[in-house]
């Protein structure tokens, strides 16, 4: 929490001092458990209570955004803010709980694939190359003072993701389920779905995401087999 807020504030102050623009990476977590069908940049945030400690990350990222935008309004810095939605790629580590590499690594050795909850929660995964291309384009067009969702609109449930991974790897893995409380304790809350509206970034950049989940999973499988 403090690392996100204090370190970001120091970077923003350095940008102000040296008159350097900044591209600030925020997160889809700032929307919390908002019930909108898809989340636009203007959707209201609905994060959980302070007793659910997992929301500290979302809260710290929201504060980062507030600081950056307040400094922009004062004419002190030139920020571009992006909210990333479940970025994945071939070299992503599973040790921090990233679901796609975690499932693939288990499937490649026929281990059980563990799903937290009932697997009906859905996510929208975005290929890392698409994310990088968006970041470069936003910096080039100098979209200062703006907030953008960066993500893919294609949804998949976590259960469907596990089944896709098993199919693509020809694995003998079984899917097992554990409740969020059993894995993380009572101080955890998980959004049921997380899908971005990306009309704004398409309008500003003229670009759409290029990769679908089948490609992403196949690419990561090939990478892990050969690394």
Regions found by a protein language model. Give the residues of each.
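Non-catalytic, hydrophobic alpha-helical segments
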Residues: 131, 135, 150, 161, ...
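Amphipathic terminal alpha-helices
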Residues: 199, 211-227
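Active-site "gating" loop of Rossmann-like NAD(P)-dependent oxidoreductase/epimerase domains
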Residues: 6, 16-17, 25-55, 70-75, ...
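Conserved C-terminal active-site "lid" loop/helix of NAD(P)H-dependent oxidoreductases
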Residues: 128, 182-208, 212
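Active-site helix of classical SDR
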Residues: 56-60
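Glycine/proline-rich active-site loop of Rossmann-fold NAD(P)-dependent oxidoreductases
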Residues: 35, 62, 75-78, 87-101, ...
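Conserved cofactor-binding/catalytic machinery of classical short-chain dehydrogenase/reductase
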Residues: 7-10, 21, 29, 45, ...
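C-terminal "lid/loop" region of Rossmann-like NAD(P)-dependent oxidoreductases
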Residues: 118, 147-148, 159-162, 170-193
């Amino acid at each position: 929490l403090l690392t996100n807020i204090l370190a970001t504030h120091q970077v923003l102050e350095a940008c102000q001092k040296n008159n350097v623009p900044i591209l600030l990476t925020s997160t889809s977590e700032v929307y919390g458990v908002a019930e909108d069908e898809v989340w636009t940049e203007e959707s209201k945030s609905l994060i959980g209570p302070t007793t659910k400690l997992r929301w500290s990350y979302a809260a710290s990222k929201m504060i980062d955004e507030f600081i950056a935008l307040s400094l922009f309004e004062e004419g002190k810095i030139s920020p571009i803010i992006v909210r990333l939605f479940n970025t994945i790629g071939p070299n992503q580590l599973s040790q921090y709980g990233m679901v796609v590499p975690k499932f693939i690594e288990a499937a490649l050795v026929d281990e059980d694939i563990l799903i937290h909850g009932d697997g009906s929660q859905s996510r929208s995964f975005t290929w890392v190359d698409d994310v990088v291309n968006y970041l470069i384009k936003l910096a080039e067009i100098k979209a200062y003072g703006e907030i953008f969702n960066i993500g893919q609109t294609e949804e998949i449930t976590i259960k469907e993701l596990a089944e896709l991974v098993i199919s693509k790897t020809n694995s003998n893995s079984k899917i097992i389920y554990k409740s969020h409380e059993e894995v993380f304790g009572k101080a955890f809350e998980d959004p049921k779905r997380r899908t971005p509206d990306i009309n704004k970034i398409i309008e500003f950049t003229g670009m759409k995401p290029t990769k679908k989940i089948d490609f992403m999973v196949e690419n990561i499988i090939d990478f892990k087999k050969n690394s």
